[in-house]
Amino acid sequence: MGNLFCCVLVKQSDVAVKERFGKFQKVLNPGLQFVPWVIGDYVAGTLTLRLQQLDVQCETKTKDNVFVTVVASIQYRVLADKASDAFYRLSNPTTQIKAYVFDVIRACVPKLNLDDVFEQKNEIAKSVEEELDKAMTAYGYEILQTLIIDIEPDQQVKRAMNEINAAARMRVAASEKAEAEKIIQIKRAEGEAESKYLSGLGIARQRQAIVDGLRDSVLGFAGNVPGTSAKDVLDMVMMTQYFDTMRDIGATSKSSAVFIPHGPGAVSDVAAQIRNGLLQANNAS
């Protein structure tokens, strides 16, 4: 701003305050303004109408006794029609704004637990903005926006919170892993059950085919060889199967088969036991 031939230049987005012998005269708008110094007029100071930002750090304690540092960002500007109030009524507007911010934050945060402070930071910012706007408008300042840009707990508390979050994530991961293993085991059991069912069907069909073949063999042999009975044919078939079994067991060195008495007479004894068991079952039914 210059002062030449009783004229001053007020820059764009600024206003100047003119006084005469120490008394307020008027607010000078941007442009070339006439200030006759010969009659005691002079420019007492200037104010910017630009948007200004003030970051305020406030340390306080939550309801659950955790110390936190809350950082609030205040965006404000001077009201052009109240520039004289902004110039004369406040000697240090930033100090006044900080005082209101401290007052509101320290009134709101102690009512909330730490987790609630993070969740309700927008409500805290709104409370600060409403209180500031109500107070600062009378002094010629407009509060445009208030933001809570950071909430910083004590370092030990922050470390504990990180450990709690890590433990919670590990619990979730362990639960998901256990659920996956459970599904795998269920599917494996279902597969084994289906496999055993199909294997049982195959064994049943195999045994049915064996029974049908034996029946046909017994009937055919008894019909073609006079003097033989069905019992004689069954004894001969069982003896043949016995020797086949002995051959299969001896073919491997790691057989886990249960070995029953192997004398030739034992086959007849086993056959007799089977027949007696069948007869007893038929009589009982």
Curated annotation (Swiss-Prot):
Q: Which gene encodes it?
A: HIR3
**Coiled-coil annotated residue ranges, if any:** 113-139, 165-185
Keyword Manganese listed: no
Quaternary assembly = Self-interacts and forms heteromers. Interacts with NB-LRR class of R proteins before R proteins (e.g. RPS2 or RPM1) are activated by the effectors.
Entry keyword annotation includes Protein transport: no
> What is the official name of this protein in its record?
Hypersensitive-induced response protein 3
List UniProt keywords, sorted A-Z.
Cell membrane, Coiled coil, Lipoprotein, Membrane, Myristate
User: What's a BP term from Gene Ontology annotated to this protein?
Assistant: response to oomycetes
Q: Which Pfam families match?
A: Band_7
Annotated TM spans:
none
One cellular component term from this protein's GO annotations in UniProt: plant-type vacuole
Q: How does it sit in the membrane?
A: Lipid-anchor
Q: Mind giving the lineage of the organism this protein is from? A: Eukaryota, Viridiplantae, Streptophyta, Embryophyta, Tracheophyta
The record, for InterPro entries, names: Band7/mec-2_domain, Band_7, Band_7/SPFH_dom_sf
Q: Where is the lipid attached (N-myristoyl glycine)?
A: 2
Q: What PANTHER family does this protein's entry cite? A: HYPERSENSITIVE-INDUCED RESPONSE PROTEIN 3 (PTHR43327:SF51), STOMATIN-LIKE PROTEIN 2, MITOCHONDRIAL (PTHR43327)
Judging by the UniProt lineage, the source's domain of life is Eukaryota
Q: Which organism is it from?
A: Arabidopsis thaliana (Mouse-ear cress)
Q: Where in the cell is it found?
A: Cell membrane
